[in-house]
């Protein structure tokens, strides 16, 4: 029964992509270029991608999601305003481990549970924690660069798994891209069967040294969430899901660590909040979570 429900749910998502998406040539929007996934994503997708594309996989504690935050610099963003600890996290992500707690809106919790239970687990991708203590044993954080022959970092892979369940929470590919009429954005690509979910996040540097990454816009071509489906070898359907927005607020804490509030909204309604405590330590493993309720009380409100 679970398999049947999952198949129906996946078919419905594809139907929405075909109904609401625009048909495009793959090369017509390079800022959306990204790999599409097989039926199961799992832990090795990025290595298979590297092998197929002739890319070198580089690992190490100094590997970061962005080789240099200055890649995001524009008239509206100055990376030199970022707090050193925030900048170091993005440029040397492999040095850090993460603890995470989740808080779902009661209104959207049943939908989230069904989507993760019937779809995410089948494809081994995007298994958001449904309960605050679901990641109490910690989560892995494996960062690897995919580099072409010229030495250019094409994508940075960031794989995060729940140490308790072994489920893949995220298997994402990170880069920068500039949508039409916008400055450089953080680009994240989450491969899914026959396509991907691409999120373009507009950066903001705040006076306190914190960083905001915002995925929201009004029309196709703005930062936001794009659901992409491969239809033919060189053709895709691209659905700009305007109602789905995200906000990341990354800020330094007084104890020297970094914290992140991640808000997901649907047409302005709160869906999910994730809070990350990011500390320097053994690469690839996060420490056991302690008292999430007390920790969550320290979360800043990010609107």
What are the functions of these language-model segments?
Residues 24-266, 270-275, 279, 290:
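Soluble ligand-binding/transfer domains with enclosed cavities or grooves
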Residues 279-285:
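C-terminal or internal capping secondary-structure element at the end of a domain, subdomain, or sheet
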Residues 1-48, 300-303:
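Intrinsically disordered, low-structural-confidence terminal and linker regions
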Residues 289-303:
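TerminUS-proximal long segments
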